[in-house]
Amino acid sequence: MEDRAGQQERPSLRLEKLQHWARHRQSGRLLVLAVSQLWLAVAVVPFAVSVACLNSACHMTTALPLGPGILGLLTGIVTLELRRAPRLWKLAGLLVLELSAEAFTLGGVLVSAYSLFLLSQRKPRCCRSQSLRYQELQEGLSELEEVPELETGPTVASTAKRTNQ
């Protein structure tokens, strides 16, 4: 009798394990989707900062890559919250989230490519104030090179030592 009870217990244990696996399989897909979106957001923000460093005068170029990064971050957070939602919301929300995640990823790539295109097409006089400051620094450096006192400085010091001797 105990053998029969043990045999009946085993299938129910297997069934329970399969049900547990089926419940968490969808949750695992959501977790992978959330992590990929969070990584996209983390990767896009430094790109936006580097674009800003290349051309600080054009704010549009700086703001373009930040949009997909922020949207990817929000999608990742919503996806993590969706893992705790009831099953009905998971089924409908999963499809919407997968499509929106793909759209955000594609949007991030397109916007980043467009911002690089804008950087490559910028005119040389786009940042005129920066180039003027650079020219002023160059002129100041050339004035320092022309000062003859730097060459006579050590000789004056050496003659002062001779007079003391």
Curated annotation (Swiss-Prot):
Domain of life: Eukaryota
Chain coiled-coil ranges: none
Signal peptide boundaries: none
Membrane topology term: Multi-pass membrane protein
A GO-annotated cellular component: membrane
Keyword Transmembrane helix appears in the UniProt entry: yes
Residue intervals passing through the bilayer: 31-51, 60-80, 91-111
Compartment(s) where it occurs, according to its Swiss-Prot or TrEMBL record: Membrane
Record's keyword terms, sorted: Membrane, Transmembrane, Transmembrane helix
Stretches with biased composition (Polar residues): 155-165
Region (Disordered): 145-165
UniProt keyword annotation of Transmembrane helix present: yes
Protein name: Transmembrane protein 253
Natural source organism: Bos taurus (Bovine)
